[in-house]
Amino acid sequence: MAEDRFPGWHGTTILAVRRGGEVVVAGDGQVSLGQTVIKGTARKVRRLSPGGHEVVAGFAGSTADAFTLLERLEKKLEAAPGQLARACVQLAKDWRMDKYLRNLEAMLIVTDGETLLVLTGAGDVLEPEHDVTAIGSGGNFALAAARGLMATDLPAEEIARKAMAIAADICVYTNGNLTVERISK
């Protein structure tokens, strides 16, 4: 899925898989400008610990915009420790109402090991119906592969790695250099 909302810059696949009491978030390392790979080892999945409560976040879109959103999410989490959904809804409200934030071009997947949410560029907070979600240029490929692999007995991390490998084989804006973070509640 090409992201027309982010013209010029392409190249992110972030996938989250929840299974067996843990959530695994995986992201590829490729950043492209047009038809050129600018970097192959970008780290788009981060572990945050605001107020001592661990959260894992993966981002797609503009890196600077994503970092701005991550910083604001950390502040919301400090104000509502251990309440990921509440912090994300508060961030989404700001995102929709603030003139500056409305122009940010990024999406986030966030989890505390129990709650799994997607924050869209439109300021929406979505909880996936299934225990899998994905964003970015290869997100649909990774999502389809992971949903198929959920029918197996594979653990979450293996599902994430296999699905990301499939996405990297299909999407030219996704590579196999993965950052993988696991978190459980």
UniProtKB/Swiss-Prot annotation:
<dbReference type="GO" id="GO:0005839">
    <property type="term" value="C:proteasome core complex"/>
</dbReference>
<keyword id="KW-0378">Hydrolase</keyword>
<keyword id="KW-0888">Threonine protease</keyword>
<keyword id="KW-0645">Protease</keyword>
<dbReference type="GO" id="GO:0051603">
    <property type="term" value="P:proteolysis involved in protein catabolic process"/>
</dbReference>
<keyword id="KW-0479">Metal-binding</keyword>
<comment type="subunit">
    <text>A double ring-shaped homohexamer of HslV is capped on each side by a ring-shaped HslU homohexamer. The assembly of the HslU/HslV complex is dependent on binding of ATP.</text>
</comment>
<keyword id="KW-0021">Allosteric enzyme</keyword>
<dbReference type="GO" id="GO:0046872">
    <property type="term" value="F:metal ion binding"/>
</dbReference>
<keyword id="KW-0963">Cytoplasm</keyword>
<feature type="binding site">
    <location>
        <position position="171"/>
    </location>
    <ligand>
        <name>Na(+)</name>
    </ligand>
</feature>
<feature type="binding site">
    <location>
        <position position="174"/>
    </location>
    <ligand>
        <name>Na(+)</name>
    </ligand>
</feature>
<dbReference type="InterPro" id="IPR029055">
    <property type="entry name" value="Ntn_hydrolases_N"/>
</dbReference>
<keyword id="KW-0915">Sodium</keyword>
<feature type="binding site">
    <location>
        <position position="168"/>
    </location>
    <ligand>
        <name>Na(+)</name>
    </ligand>
</feature>
<dbReference type="InterPro" id="IPR001353">
    <property type="entry name" value="Proteasome_sua/b"/>
</dbReference>
<protein>
    <recommendedName>
        <fullName>ATP-dependent protease subunit HslV</fullName>
        <ecNumber>3.4.25.2</ecNumber>
    </recommendedName>
</protein>
<dbReference type="GO" id="GO:0004298">
    <property type="term" value="F:threonine-type endopeptidase activity"/>
</dbReference>
<dbReference type="GO" id="GO:0009376">
    <property type="term" value="C:HslUV protease complex"/>
</dbReference>
<dbReference type="InterPro" id="IPR023333">
    <property type="entry name" value="Proteasome_suB-type"/>
</dbReference>
<comment type="function">
    <text>Protease subunit of a proteasome-like degradation complex believed to be a general protein degrading machinery.</text>
</comment>
<feature type="active site">
    <location>
        <position position="12"/>
    </location>
</feature>
<dbReference type="InterPro" id="IPR022281">
    <property type="entry name" value="ATP-dep_Prtase_HsIV_su"/>
</dbReference>
<dbReference type="Pfam" id="PF00227">
    <property type="entry name" value="Proteasome"/>
</dbReference>
<comment type="similarity">
    <text>Belongs to the peptidase T1B family. HslV subfamily.</text>
</comment>
